[in-house]
Curated annotation (Swiss-Prot):
Catalyzes the transfer of glucose from UDP-glucose to ecdysteroids which are insect molting hormones. Acts on the host at the organismal level to block its development, thereby increasing the yield of progeny virus. This is Ecdysteroid UDP-glucosyltransferase. It comes from the Viruses. The keyword Signal applies. Keywords: Glycoprotein, Glycosyltransferase, Signal, Transferase.
Length: 506
């Protein structure tokens, strides 16, 4: 009997310690995959075997782990990429800005079609045809289309992971507070005033993503067969949402245990040791008169798409700051025929962490991406944010609220307005740095208490351990309101009945 008990215990431990996991991360964004890579490597270090469906950006499996990492190249076709870029160029403002007005189902359909093409890739089709079994499916939260893999590998439960903020639809899926025009605004918004117009914007965004889900349903049935469940039904399999974010940035949203805020900065947890700057850049920074201003709009922004007037607005601003050395990450092709001010140094790439930690660094002009702001907080460098897409608008707004940055409207900002914001963070640097130190200390305190990567792995393994009984309320992390239509959640029929009964008495 004792031997049987030990065998049962060993079987249970093995089920968790050597799980077969499928991860599906189709969005070809470098800033997303530097987060996913760390998470996947941590799973492999815990002896899990992970198969990753991803674009060919960079390799995940760079070391030898207790578990295996198998990469399935799901690169989109060159033609599809060109089509996506061409279509998006038609609605971007100033060449690069995709604000709330541009967030429509029609504009985002190209992204869903890109996912479809990736899953039609011969490598992915071969994976599906192999009839391999998995104990867990992990998909990126931004790509609901990828939830179909939870259906293909049923009964494996599903986890969604985001490199930063979650979508309102993600919170709906797991039963968290998803929407409020003021306290929990949709991350696709670019204006955060307490106005009736923004209430209408929230309603429009809800409708657009409903339309996009219906478009996705049609493509799913076309690709995987007429019996493929809808997005709404596929969401029922999601048991956990992991967010690479500290809850303070999300207004301390009330959430059930099915949402775990990891604290942010996961890409820094196992980053390579800080390397030295090139001697040339180091020398340029050391001899700067008043300091150095670093300008980078991240890895997802194509600087070749800058509208000319926006490009020259930036150049004219930098020219005015002639006491400062400007390090500007921009494609060489953009500026090769432009005579730049003497204080401006451009490159395709800079060692961002090393630049930000240099003793002469004074300010950081950024798109407001989460990974960039993590590195700015780490270095204590005040930011001026020019958000251009996605959650950058909300994050920039939140950074300004917390007193560590200035946020500007990239669609309308002028050289004078940008200069005022830059001078503000330069001349009031002690105040900004104080706020940054306080925020960084708070975040680090919580990370020391709940290490981000440990938290992600432990909750992942909890879902794996109880995968056979996940439908039982005893084991579920979700609330009973998870994925419930708003008409049912707000009990419209009951409310209507009460109102009608009340009216009949008059």
């Amino acid at each position: 009997m004792t031997i049987l008990c030990w065998l049962a215990l060993l079987s249970t431990l093995t089920a968790v310690n050597a799980a077969n996991i499928l991860a599906v991360f189709p969005t070809p964004a470098y800033s997303h995959h530097i987060v996913y890579k760390v998470y996947i490597e941590a799973l492999a270090e815990k002896c899990h075997n992970v198969t990753v469906v991803k674009p060919k950006l960079f390799a995940y499996s760079t070391k030898t782990y207790c578990g295996n990492i198998t990469e399935i190249n799901a690169d989109m076709s060159v033609e599809q990429y060109k089509k996506l870029v061409a279509n998006s160029a038609m609605f971007r403002k100033r060449g690069v800005v995709s604000d709330t007005d541009t967030v429509t189902a029609a504009n985002y359909l190209g992204l869903i079609e890109m996912f479809k093409d990736q899953f039609d890739n011969i490598n992915v089709r071969n994976l599906i045809a192999n009839n391999q079994t998995f104990d867990l499916v992990v998909v990126e939260a931004f790509a609901d289309y990828a939830l179909v893999f939870g259906h293909l590998y049923d009964p494996a439960p599903v986890i969604q992971i985001a490199p930063g903020y979650g979508l309102a639809e993600n919170f709906d899926t797991v039963g968290a507070v998803a929407r409020h025009p003021v306290h929990h605004p949709n991350i696709w918004r670019s204006n955060f005033d307490d106005t009736e117009a923004n209430v209408m914007t929230e309603m429009r965004l809800y409708k657009e993503f409903k339309i996009l889900a219906n478009m996705s349903n049609a493509l799913l049935k076309q690709q995987f067969g007429p019996n493929t469940p809808t997005i709404e039904k596929l969401r029922n399999k999601v048991q956990l949402l992991l967010l690479n974010l500290h809850p303070i940035f999300d207004n301390n949203r009330p959430v059930p245990p099915s949402v775990q805020y990891l604290g942010g900065g996961i890409h820094l947890v196992k980053s390579a040791p800080l390397t030295k700057l090139s001697p040339v850049i180091n020398a340029q920074m050391n001899k700067s008169k008043s300091g150095t201003i670093y300008v980078s709009f991240g890895s997802s922004i194509d600087t070749k798409s800058f509208a000319n007037e926006f490009l020259y607005m930036l150049i004219n601003t930098f020219k005015t700051l002639d006491n400062y050395t400007i390090l500007w990450k921009i494609d060489d092709e953009v500026v090769k025929n432009i005579t730049l001010p003497a204080n401006v140094i451009t490159q395709n790439w800079f060692n961002q962490r090393a630049v930000l930690r240099h003793k002469k660094m004074a300010a950081f002009i950024t798109q407001g991406g989460l990974q960039s702001s993590d590195e700015a907080l780490e270095a204590g460098i005040p930011m001026v944010c020019l958000p251009m897409m996605g959650d950058q608008f909300y994050h920039a707004h939140k950074l300004q609220q917390l007193g560590v940055a200035r946020a500007l409207d990239t669609v309308t900002v002028s050289s004078d307005q940008l200069l005022v914001a830059i001078n503000d963070v330069l001349f009031n640097a002690p105040t900004y740095k104080k706020h940054m130190a306080e925020l960084y200390a708070l975040i680090n305190h919580d990370k020391a208490t709940f290490p981000p990567l440990d938290k992600a792995i432990k909750f992942t393994e909890r879902v794996i351990r109880y995968r056979h009984d996940i439908s039982r309320q005893l084991y579920s992390l979700k609330t009973t309101a998870a994925n419930v239509p708003y008409s049912n959640y707000y009990m419209y029929k009951s409310v209507f009945s009460i109102v009608m009964n009340h009216l009949t008495h008059f």
